């Protein structure tokens, strides 16, 4: 069981730098704690012993999870006790790619009042029918943003989403995330938000060619401010794979083939994104300018057999003809997991689709990294002591039966799965009475909460 100290409370609403633009009010408690409330959510401020609190579940009283004076452990335990199996499952899910406004055809298409956007009369910042469904019916809170009409539209959409979910159930906020978006050109689904009207920077190899970690850290600090202004609190980056296979088409997005250089650059990137400046810091490096960094791809996505990428079956194997497996994990274990700043480590890590061929010397299984007890539990969790969030690659398990999936969730030691909600429901049903998911309260929910609470919404940050 992961220790409770890593559980961060979910029920403190997100702030963005654009909160003044919509119906959001702030109140300051006697001790100086600032709370933000969406006027349309139905959530009210209550006073207890002269201090102010948000009545997130709207029951007219102060519950322990709403009391910012209590410890992380006390608040988390109370929140977990109030959550249903379905809500727990929702916190372990990620949305499909969401463009703002939603596209009208193809992957990720959406509607507004059952009409395509162009015919709906809706504002570009409105919440689509599909978004309302996964937020309300599926209890999903981790949302992946791609292209947005403008920064203003993105900020307003975020505020609309936060107002919507604040009025649902326990008031758990949305954790909006993004693949890298500060480059000039969209090349694939994993940088579909690039090319927007924010600062534009070189991609990985070009940044690596500067040999300047300080510059990369500066980029992280600037990009984090932009992300927060857009309402984004998790960066699905950096990509700290080693570029050891020149035929791999994702090599342009890595810093180098050198373990030492990638370690230094990746560490600087995470420090820049996660650590708030002195005036913006609230606690332990986290603050109003912090964005959670999800490093990828554990245990290294670079050694693709023949350069064929793991997004496709033809590239399913990661191979190590020079037996350099340990070089590929060095940017994680000696860089992203050992930060100098107050946040200490990257908030999350993503394993790659690939099968790390013949690396499992305990269970002797050649399975995808996200399904490998050896890669995730024995190495990442136990040997290297990583206790942050582990999030699978997108749609890594679309062809698995619920029996396989149940074992994957139960034994894989993962926190987020990029799978359809129906798969979690099926797994729960397969377990008979939902016991499998209930057992994940202390593990999955605890780490999932880091991402939602990892910025200024972290319980330790008020």
Predicted regions and their residues:
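Bacterial N-terminal signal peptides that target proteins for export
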Residues: 1-8
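Bacterial N-terminal signal peptides
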Residues: 9-18
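Glycoside hydrolase catalytic-domain context in secreted enzymes
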Residues: 22-462
